């Protein structure tokens, strides 16, 4: 599972703590601090397809520390600082936080720079996965950052043999 060491602790400890504090969704499990099957399915669906409305709600609640329906630079930095430490531990060069924030502003185009409302996040749902992954899922963030842009462009061209 994503919480275990053999998966490289894909999710950040801060995100896992918020999930087990039952912030994004109350557990149906009758055992304290344990997910039951239904809880796990909700989590996995939210983790694997971050473009669905329910998934966006789930991850938005994880990141929105003060529950005001706006993700602020402070909240993003709170989660990203753990990612930076994890990247450095793996000898990856982390992106500076200000650069990451700039990229997220370009992605979402919020009405107030650096402040991302739920509706603004939902409006870019086709590409919102990277917004959440850079803050909570190290493996998916690294995969995104190390993707081959030339190969992607080649795959997207109508006539790849002539590009």
Regions found by a protein language model. Name each.
Residues 61-63:
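Hydrophobic alpha-helical bundle architecture
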Residues 1-11, 19-22, 34-48, 71-92, ...:
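Amphipathic regulatory helices of Ca2+-sensor modules
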Residues 12-16, 36, 52-59, 72-76, ...:
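Alpha-helical interaction elements in eukaryotic regulators
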Residues 21, 45-47, 58, 102-103, ...:
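Eukaryotic intrinsically disordered and solvent-exposed regulatory patches
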Residues 2-8, 14-17, 22, 26, ...:
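Intrinsically disordered, low-complexity regulatory segments of kinases
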Residues 66-68:
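Acidic carboxylate motifs that coordinate Ca2+ or other divalent cations, activating on Asp/Glu
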Residues 95-163:
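C-terminal interaction modules of eukaryotic adaptor/scaffold proteins
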């Amino acid at each position: 599972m994503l919480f275990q060491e053999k998966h490289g602790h894909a999710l950040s400890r801060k995100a896992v703590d918020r999930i087990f504090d039952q912030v994004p969704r109350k557990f149906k499990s009758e055992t304290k601090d344990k997910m039951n099957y239904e809880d796990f399915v909700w989590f996995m669906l939210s983790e694997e397809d971050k473009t669905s409305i329910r998934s966006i709600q789930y991850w938005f609640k994880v990141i929105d520390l003060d529950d005001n329906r706006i993700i602020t630079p402070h909240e993003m930095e709170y989660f990203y600082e753990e990612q930076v430490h994890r990247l450095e531990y793996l000898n990856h060069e982390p992106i500076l936080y200000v650069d990451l924030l700039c990229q997220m502003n370009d992605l979402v185009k919020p009405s107030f720079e650096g402040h991302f409302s739920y509706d603004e996040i939902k409006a870019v749902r086709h590409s919102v996965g990277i917004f959440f992954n850079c803050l909570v899922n190290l493996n998916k963030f690294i995969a995104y950052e190390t993707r081959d842009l030339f190969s992607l462009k080649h795959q997207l061209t109508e006539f790849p043999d002539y590009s």
